[in-house]
Amino acid sequence: MAIRPILPYPHAGLSGICAPVTVFDDHLRELVTDLIDTMRAAPGVGITAAHIGVLQRVFVLELTPGTILTYINPEITSHSPQTMRHVEGSVSMPGFTDEVERPSTVEVRFQDITGAEQTETAEGFHAICIQHEIDQLDGIFWLKRLSRLKRDRLVKKWEKSRNP
């Protein structure tokens, strides 16, 4: 329906903790549609409601073109002891990426757009994306998963790119 403005890092809205969704109605469907449109325009493979200034526990992923995955009130219920490293970034900090280490498999409980409870086991890149977006719903920007040295270097480059 609409491409919404994305909050740029380090906007305070990105560190807010998102509230659970309690009403599954047309407003929620409109939010999800706006998230999809905004994510595709960014472009990105995932986006949370927090990225557009809405502090609700909603995110969408598009890992395969044309296949949208919607997660409402997601919660990781278990994860593997095995980890993997993968390059991560954010629509709030376009063009800046680094490797982050996370569990390679997760089980997630969530609700779909109708409010129905779902569970899913995700592996590899899919698992990484779920963890990344749930972190954002909890106010944890992906940079916090880096060492202080890497984080400081990226933030300096980001600030310089915004204020040449």
UniProtKB/Swiss-Prot annotation:
Pfam hit, one: Pep_deformylase
Membrane-traversing stretches: none
Top-level taxon: Bacteria
Residues forming the catalytic site: E133
Biological process terms in GO annotation: co-translational protein modification; translation
Xref: InterPro entries: Peptide_deformylase, Peptide_deformylase_sf
GO molecular function, one term: peptide deformylase activity
SUPFAM superfamilies attached to this UniProt entry: Peptide deformylase
CDD domains: Pep_deformylase
Protein family per UniProt: Belongs to the polypeptide deformylase family.
NCBIfam families in the record: pept_deformyl, PRK12846.1-5
Protein name: Peptide deformylase-like
Origin species: Agrobacterium fabrum (strain C58 / ATCC 33970)
Lineage: Bacteria, Pseudomonadati, Pseudomonadota, Alphaproteobacteria, Hyphomicrobiales
